[in-house]
Amino acid sequence: RNDRAAYVAAGKDGLHFEAPRQWTFDDGTDLGSYNTQAHWVTHEEGLFLVYTRRGAGNDNVVRHRAPLFMAQVDPARLVVLRATEIELVPNKGAQLGNFAVVDVSERETWVTTSEGMSPGNPAKFGSNGRVYAARIIWEKPNRMWDRH
């Protein structure tokens, strides 16, 4: 767990990696993610990251674990492309930090999560323990969808 930043590293064989570097947007600014999960969404035409971050009007959520964002990653530079960032699951006051990604078909990927009703009364912001399945519908089929 890191209370300051999130990091990324690349390697060719899955065993040996370059030195970790802090996740940033393509303009060089800090991604703002820390202390929680991030997951890859893969498509044959792009690599995407699902994450939480600070700086999204979300100081009301423990460790800024809502909303869930998704953005495309430049795999050569290991940066998140800011212009591609979208909000997948909204901030309703509860934590969304424990989530999963699953390829359902060549045309659809889901990001699933639930509202973690931790202390601090997240219900006052609209949370009620919802379960989410954010559906990503691809314009072009992802022929890699079942090759994990």
Regions picked out by a protein language model, each given a short descriptive name:
Residues R1-G32, E44-G46, T52-K92, E106, ...:
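Beta-rich carbohydrate-recognition and catalytic domains
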Residues F99-T112:
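Acidic, serine/threonine- and proline-rich intrinsically disordered appendage/tail regions
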Residues T36-H39, Q95-V102:
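Beta-propeller and closely related beta-sheet repeat lectin domains
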